[in-house]
Curated annotation (Swiss-Prot):
Family according to the record: Belongs to the hemocyanin family.
Organism, as annotated: Manduca sexta
Single annotated GO MF: nutrient reservoir activity
Subcellular location: Secreted, Extracellular space
First-listed, main subcellular location of the protein, grouped into a coarse class: secreted
Disulfide bond residue pairs: none
Organism placement in taxonomy: Eukaryota, Metazoa, Ecdysozoa, Arthropoda, Hexapoda
Keywords for the protein's UniProt record, in alphabetical order: Glycoprotein, Secreted, Signal, Storage protein
Function of the protein: Arylphorin is a larval storage protein (LSP) which may serve as a storage protein used primarily as a source of aromatic amino acids for protein synthesis during metamorphosis. It is a constituent of the sclerotizing system of the cuticle, and serves as a carrier for ecdysteroid hormone.
Stored Gene3D superfamilies: Di-copper center containing domain from catechol oxidase (1.10.1280.10), Hemocyanin, C-terminal domain (2.60.40.1520), Hemocyanin, N-terminal domain (1.20.1370.10)
CC terms in the record's Gene Ontology section: extracellular region
Tagged with keyword Zinc: no
Protein name in UniProt: Arylphorin subunit beta
InterPro entries, per database record: Di-copper_centre_dom_sf, Hemocyanin/hexamerin, Hemocyanin/hexamerin_mid_dom, Hemocyanin_C, Hemocyanin_C_sf, Hemocyanin_N, Hemocyanin_N_sf, Ig_E-set
Signal peptide location: 1-16
């Protein structure tokens, strides 16, 4: 007798009863000229792994001659260098691309120069069309994303979510294989059998119910966090951050915010690690583990992921980092860390026309640049051969992939791509390690005095926070860019037939009500932070030990009137969060109405508002909110595109940008509020979907 146990949820799959909720989003109006250019920009993202001879870009790219149009570029030398490099041989099509390999990155920077230095949009589009036809797909996309984000004449243009452009980097291989098989079979043989494996047809497209990774991938406690570390919105957020400020980016050459670049680097990772720590706490995991370059790494990772060409490298638990193959790299990493500590012990750094005093809070710019090892650290007079990147070498060592076979052929690891890095537990351990060194520098800073933190005449009387509730809900994303189309299908403008459905963390909207009494009319800044209340053992956390775990939720200015002021802030209005990205199919429909999604146009580099809160528990997990009010002093510099990070003349994260004295945080312009985060509905996301295998019981062999 053989009994097959199938989850009751499969009935729901077959009936298609679980439909993702469509959330509203803000739109903005655009003119006809914008629409025309926006469509051209979007078209080059479509099905990038194959070219369509029928599309407009193909004919333009085929016929375009870069050298004949050299006068249409503002930096002829950069374009000539690109052409010289291109003629000596470029990354072939259908090879994997990663910016963490020198030759591949140098070529991609050359492609970016071709795009960036185009004098006008027409030249930019023709250059991009040429690259789309002739260059490697991943290399083209990497340079194209950054160029669209950075060019002045494409400001406000919408770029599609990375998970629609690279679906294979945002879903596990078992899900992608179902997509490929359905495409090759032109459908499913048995609808009932397909439903058992999470494949259903809805309207004119197929839906694939996808689980997050389980113990097969994370053969350790890290599997509890896969719903967060594999969230497509979170991983896209990281990709956008790199596109805003690539590590190879020279601020003087490209006009980025040089004076605070290192500070932005630090604050981004500090906030990301704080948010990750929240999720660890609510899952009972506690502090982010530490590791040594000279001891086995405990956290293994077996990614069930693959590019089109190679599977991802796997790292077992207790993997030996300090192997014969890595001796030189480990020595470099260790020396790099010790050199930084020596700089701190000296109290200053002087080299490459830089004089750094580590007692100055502005030294964070140098410190951040040092750990990113970016192009601003040494300046252009230093050759790139002198510079070895701590980040890149650490990623290669921890990724556990074998040495590249040649300059173009390598086995990828999750740490080789910004789209997949956040999946690997060692990513968090590596950047937590970097932050610990930066915190060593922070110890040199004088804590803010009680007088500097005070706001005379202003008192926060009370703070009321609505009930905080998280839940999981389905979301579909288009995976059609991952398949190859026949000539006939290409003529039909690429159908969008395949959608991956996952449960994603979300929360119910909530409001924060703040009662403030002011003695006079004054302009002020109001900040709202979230922080842990207890450690993983249940002991209250002291502020002196917890200052670097505060996660910024909101930042806004307010004109107080003399007397009582009541502020009500809804979570949907919190400054540094955005709506989910809109699918490309919907983007084209909006463009027909001369509209684009506001957040995708203006705020695409922000964290999805879904991820504002960590997953709660049935009984409520304790956290605390902190409201801080201080005088407003605007920063007069042009900060685009970094408004999300820099709003005034205070350091990022102020007042938690340095160690604190607990006693100084008991003032009238501050308020700590205890809160609990609850979870509604299924606690484990895999219960929404099909099991990773069909379970059998009472199996008796026939005699």
């Amino acid at each position: 007798m053989k009994t097959v146990i199938i989850l009751a949820g499969l009935v729901a799959l077959a009936l298609g009863s679980e439909v993702p909720v469509k959330h509203s989003f803000k739109v903005k109006d655009v003119d006809a000229a914008f629409v025309e250019r926006q469509k051209k920009v979007l078209d080059l993202f479509q099905d990038v792994d194959q070219v369509n001879p029928n599309d407009e870009y193909y004919k333009i790219g085929k016929e375009y001659n870069i050298e004949a149009n050299i006068d249409n570029y503002s930096n002829k030398k950069a374009v000539e260098e690109f052409l010289q490099l291109y003629r000596t041989g470029f990354l072939p099509k259908y090879y994997e691309f990663s910016p963490f390999y020198d030759r591949l990155r140098d070529e991609a920077i050359g492609v970016f120069h071709l795009f960036y230095y185009a004098k006008d949009f027409d030249t930019f589009y023709k250059s991009a069309a040429w690259a789309r036809v002739y260059l490697n797909e991943g290399q083209f996309l990497y340079a194209y994303y950054i160029a669209v984000i950075q060019r002045k004449d494409t400001q406000g243009f919408v770029v599609p979510a990375p998970y629609e452009v690279y679906p294979q980097f945002f879903a596990n291989l078992n899900t992608m294989l179902k997509v490929y098989r359905t495409k090759m079979q032109d459908g499913v043989v048995s609808a009932d059998l397909a439903a058992q494996h999470g494949i259903v047809k809805e309207k004119n497209y197929y839906v694939y119910y996808a689980n997050y990774s389980n113990s097969l991938v994370y053969n350790n406690e890290e599997q509890r966090l896969s719903y967060f570390t594999e969230d497509i919105g979170l991983n896209s957020y990281y990709y956008y951050f790199h596109s805003h400020l690539p590590f190879w980016w020279n601020s003087e050459r490209y006009g980025a915010l040089k004076s605070r670049r290192g500070e932005i680097y630090y604050y981004f990772y500090q906030q990301l690690m704080a948010r990750y720590y929240f999720e660890r706490l609510s899952n009972g995991l506690g502090d982010i583990p530490e590791f040594s370059w000279y001891s086995p790494v405990k956290s293994g990772y077996y990614p069930l992921m693959s590019s089109y060409y190679y599977p991802f490298a796997q790292r077992p638990n207790y993997w030996n980092v300090h192997s014969e193959e890595n001796y030189e790299k480990v020595r470099f990493l260790d020396t790099y860390e010790m050199s930084f500590l020596q700089f701190l012990q000296n109290g200053h750094f002087k080299a490459f026309d830089q004089k750094i005093d580590f007692h100055d809070f502005k030294a964070i710019n140098f410190v951040g640049n040092y750990w990113q090892d970016n192009a601003d650290l040494y300046g252009e007079e230093v050759t790139k051969d002198y510079q070895r990147s701590y980040e890149i070498i650490a990623r290669q060592v921890l990724g556990a992939a074998p040495k590249p076979f040649d300059k173009y052929t390598f086995m990828p690891s999750a740490l080789d791509f910004y789209q997949t890095s956040l999946r690997d537990p060692m990513f968090y351990q590596l950047y937590n390690r970097i932050l610990k060194y930066i915190y060593e520098y922070k110890q040199y800073l004088q804590p803010y005095s009680s007088e500097k933190l005070a706001f005379k005449g202003v008192k926060v009387v009370d703070v009321v926070v609505d009930k905080l509730v998280t839940f999981f809900e389905y979301y579909d994303f288009d995976a059609s860019n991952s398949v190859f189309w026949s000539k006939e299908e290409v003529k039909s403008s690429y159908p969008h037939d395949f959608k991956i459905r996952q449960p994603r963390l979300n929360h119910k909207p909530f409001s924060v009500s703040i009662d403030i009494k002011s003695e006079a009319a004054v302009d002020a800044v109001v900040k709202i932070f979230m922080a842990p209340k207890y450690d993983d053992n249940g002991f209250p956390l002291k502020l002196e030990n917890n200052w670097n775990k505060f996660f910024e939720l909101d930042w806004f200015t307010y004109k107080f009137v003399a007397g009582d002021n009541k502020i009500v802030r809804n979570s949907n209005d919190f400054l540094i969060f955005k709506d989910d990205s809109v699918p490309m199919t919907e983007l084209y429909k909006l463009l027909e109405q001369n509209k684009v999604p506001h957040d995708m146009s203006e705020d695409y580099g922000y964290l999805p508002k879904r991820l504002m809160l960590p997953r709660g528990t049935e009984g409520g997990f304790p956290f605390q909110f902190f409201v801080f009010v201080y005088p407003f002093n605007a920063d007069s510099k042009d900060l685009a595109p970094f408004e999300a990070f820099i709003q005034d003349n205070k350091p990022l994260g102020y007042p938690f940008d340095r160690p604190v004295v607990d006693a100084y945080f008991k003032q009238h312009n501050m308020f700590f509020k205890d809160v609990f985060v609850y979870h509604d509905g299924e606690y484990f996301p895999y219960k929404f979907n099909v099991p990773s295998h069909v379970m059998h019981s009472n199996v008796v062999p026939k005699h």
